A protein has these predicted regions:
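Alpha-helical structural elements
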Residues: 9-12, 30, 146-148
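Acidic, serine/threonine-rich low-complexity disordered tracts
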Residues: 22-119, 158-262
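Hydrophobic, well-structured mid-protein blocks that either form specific transmembrane helices
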Residues: 113-155
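Bacterial Sec-dependent N-terminal signal peptides
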Residues: 1-24
Length: 262
């Protein structure tokens, strides 16, 4: 499996953990979020999240389509072009994925994959023209998440009920492999942004030992402390440099939710 640093960062940003607190109805139709990914003042990439306005249906299961797109910008798009697209069709009643699609274009590398989740049977059917064999079945738990559904499990919970030091974890299926991610609640802080000062919940993400991140507290994620509970800001201390991800725009059904300061 080939997973770029950018792909891993997007994975971490939008799939963090499953929580145990009061649940919320958060799978909103017509939602659009845009993020800026930058090294200091240099824009490196952007990421967009879009949810369909209307429900669809797969195998007679009602679903809402969610799409995440990440792409490089400027000089990064010249020397290391990347366009990654993830799509998830989620059951609104359970927030479990019914079908997930991935399309990676990273330099000369290409990867397409489709995963059909059968939670009642404990099976994920994975199909990719780049895999050998092309089709395979993978045994999964009946609550296995994909990249995008994990993001909504996070937003579904009342994060303000959490205590500092509380730890959580989850397993997700991405690119044919299961990842486990841990999260530690670090505190409640005010974050300065283009939208003014925002109350946020700060967390730290912990991964198994790897050669990408500088230290155990290298990934810091701030989640908005409001009814929307969206990833508001992220800072990553890589061995190759310091990277930031900031919210640029947030709309629901075309209506601006956070207004930028003049």
């Amino acid at each position: 499996m080939k997973t770029s640093n950018f792909t891993l960062l997007i994975l971490l940003f939008f799939q963090v953990f499953r929580l145990t607190a009061q649940e919320k109805d958060i799978l909103i139709g017509g939602e659009q979020l845009k993020y800026r990914i930058h090294l200091g003042f240099i824009n490196a990439a952007e990421a967009n999240i879009r949810s369909s306005s209307n429900l669809g249906s797969i195998r007679q299961i009602p679903t809402r389509k969610i799409e995440i797109e990440g792409k490089t910008l400027g000089i990064f798009n010249v020397f290391s072009p990347l366009l990654d697209v993830w799509v998830s069709h989620i059951d609104p009643s359970t927030l479990l994925p019914v079908k997930a699609e991935m399309n990676k274009r990273e330099g000369r590398y290409r990867k397409q994959e489709v995963v059909d989740f059968y939670h009642d049977k404990g099976i994920a059917q994975i199909s990719s023209p780049q895999n050998s064999p092309k089709d395979k079945n993978l045994a999964i738990s009946n609550s296995m998440l994909d990249l995008i559904s994990g993001y909504y499990f996070l937003r579904k919970k009342n994060l303000q009920d959490l205590e500092i030091g509380q730890k959580m974890s989850a397993k997700i299926l991405v690119d044919g492999q299961v990842y486990e991610i841990w999260c530690v609640v670090k505190g409640f802080e005010k974050v300065e942004s283009k939208f003014g000062t925002k109350n946020c919940i700060r967390t730290s993400l912990v991964l198994p030992k790897n050669n990408l991140f500088q230290d155990k507290d290298a990934i810091r994620l701030w989640i908005s402390q409001d009814n929307y509970q969206i990833p508001f800001k992220m800072e990553v201390n890589l061995k190759i440099g310091f990277l930031s991800i900031d919210l640029e725009d947030y709309k629901i059904a075309g209506k601006t939710i956070y207004t930028a300061l003049p």
